[in-house]
């Protein structure tokens, strides 16, 4: 029976895995080692700035173990969404780390670097041709959005990975790509049923995340065959059951029954999850419908401004009883003070926001719980067109806030406790995601290029 054995090293490169688990998994003779290295979960900063979620040391530790294991077994190592967002600077950063490891460990391999960063001129042409369309709740999109974007990436499907593997790449490091494409490319290339492959890839994408209780990041392992796959964690402390595996279909997904990929849609409505031991689950019954139109999702981020924040807490029960009105009056007083210092023209050039921890900081207006405890935390945030301006405005806010009165108290009061001195904390540049759109390329490879390199030879 044809099968592909897949080792998922971890949920996101840099978050770690246990070395002994990797060794145990290698004893199961995987056909390749894969790991995602990115996500939009940490927000737009990483795509906008090119920074990375983890340190170079964290990436190097994980990638070193993967490369050593992969080269010893002569199997490919495949990494997607390099260094968080998969932009060109982040791709080059991870490729550089791979080169350093090869030099230090005296390894040699053929490396494929898949570029996902998009040319702005190309996107403008596609926009004029009507080849860029919005997804649900997409913001407005025009050439100005393209121009303002610090980086724009396309989320690659399996095709760039397949091309790299067919060209003999032993290590593949990709820019932005769908998490599942990392694990689907080789099995689909080898002719396995796409429905089974894509479903297995969805379960493997986050390493050990589909176990019953994941206490720390670690490896996962699956055997993929035409009509089913079996997932069993190589860490003996972990186990999967049907509920833990099935529930992972909801992770980063609006529905547990459909997963949209560039080439089609995985449907898990008829999937069956069967415990074949106290640690392993057999999954079968999914279907895959090929898309009528091949599309690539775009991700972009633009500079929203520069921020400064203040963290404080309020414990006075008199203030807490009238917290909403007190904060509204405080905010108005702070804005009036800013206008007095900088002139009326300052209005509209900055934003002052307040978040209340212990009231509705997580859910905002969707919060159903109305009770407030004995204290709350406050986060004041100013966003302006420069760091100097944001910090300066926050200095005015901090002084107004710390002594803002309530009618029940006479004289000067101190209403907020600040844990830091100075109270205002510069946060640097702040970015926002600015697109939720797909492109219809002329071919699956039109938006991606691959650089090949013989490393260590």
Go through the PLM ranges and name each one:
Residues 1-9, 15, 34, 76, ...:
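Small-residue-enriched flexible segments
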Residues 12-14, 39-41, 82-92, 176-182, ...:
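Gly/Ser/Thr-rich loops at beta-strand to alpha-helix junctions
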Residues 17-20, 44-48, 89-95, 121-131, ...:
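Short acidic, glycine/serine/threonine-rich loops at helix termini
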Residues 27-45, 68-73:
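N-terminal glycine-rich anion-binding loops that anchor highly charged ligand groups
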Residues 52, 75-86, 171-172, 377-383:
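Short glycine-rich or small-residue beta-strand-to-loop segments that form or flank ligand, phosphate
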Residues 108-126, 357-359, 417-427:
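Short, conserved secondary-structure transition motifs
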Residues 119-174:
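An acidic, phosphate/nucleotide-engaging active-site surface
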Residues 294-457:
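C-terminal non-catalytic interaction/assembly regions of soluble proteins
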């Amino acid at each position: 029976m044809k099968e592909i054995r897949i080792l998922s090293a971890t949920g996101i490169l840099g978050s770690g895995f246990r070395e002994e688990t990797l060794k145990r998994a290698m004893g199961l003779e995987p056909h390749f080692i894969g790991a995602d290295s990115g996500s939009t979960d940490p927000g737009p900063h990483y795509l906008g700035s090119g920074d990375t979620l983890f340190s170079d040391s964290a990436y190097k530790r994980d990638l070193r173990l993967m490369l050593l294991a992969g080269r010893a077994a002569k199997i490919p190592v495949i990494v997607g969404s390099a260094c968080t967002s998969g932009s060109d600077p982040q791709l080059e950063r991870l490729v550089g780390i791979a080169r350093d490891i090869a030099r230090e460990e005296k390894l040699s391999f053929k490396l494929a670097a898949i570029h996902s960063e998009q040319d702005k001129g190309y996107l403008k042409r596609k926009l004029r041709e009507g080849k860029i369309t919005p997804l649900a709740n997409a913001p407005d999109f025009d050439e100005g959005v393209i121009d303002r974007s610090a980086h724009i990436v396309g989320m690659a499907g399996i095709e760039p990975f397949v091309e790299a593997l067919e060209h003999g790449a032993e290590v593949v490091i990709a820019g932005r790509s769908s998490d599942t494409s990392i694990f689907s490319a080789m099995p689909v290339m080898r002719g396995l049923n796409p429905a089974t492959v894509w479903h297995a890839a969805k379960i493997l994408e986050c390493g050990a995340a589909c176990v019953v209780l994941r206490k720390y990041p670690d490896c996962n392992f699956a055997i993929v065959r035409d009509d089913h796959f079996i997932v069993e964690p190589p860490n003996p402390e972990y186990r999967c059951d049907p509920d833990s595996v099935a529930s992972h279909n909801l992770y980063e997904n609006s529905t547990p029954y459909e997963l949209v990929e560039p080439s089609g849609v995985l449907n898990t409505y008829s999937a069956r999850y069967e415990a074949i031991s106290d640690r392993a689950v057999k999954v079968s019954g999914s279907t895959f419908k090929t898309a009528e139109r091949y599309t690539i999702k775009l991700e972009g981020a633009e500079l929203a401004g520069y921020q400064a924040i203040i963290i404080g807490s309020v414990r006075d029960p008199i203030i807490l009883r009238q917290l909403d009105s007190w904060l509204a009056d405080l905010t108005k007083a702070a804005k009036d003070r800013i206008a007095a210092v900088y002139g009326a023209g300052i209005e509209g050039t900055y934003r002052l926001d307040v978040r209340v921890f212990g009231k509705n900081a997580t859910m905002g207006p969707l919060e159903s719980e109305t009770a407030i405890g004995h204290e709350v935390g406050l986060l004041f945030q100013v966003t302006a067109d420069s760091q100097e301006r944001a910090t300066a405005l926050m200095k005015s806010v901090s002084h107004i806030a710390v002594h803002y009165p309530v009618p029940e108290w006479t004289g000067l009061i101190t209403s907020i406790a600040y844990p830091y001195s100075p109270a205002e904390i510069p946060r640097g540049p702040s970015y926002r995601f600015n697109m939720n759109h797909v492109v219809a390329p002329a071919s699956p490879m039109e938006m991606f290029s691959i650089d090949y390199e013989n490393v260590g030879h």
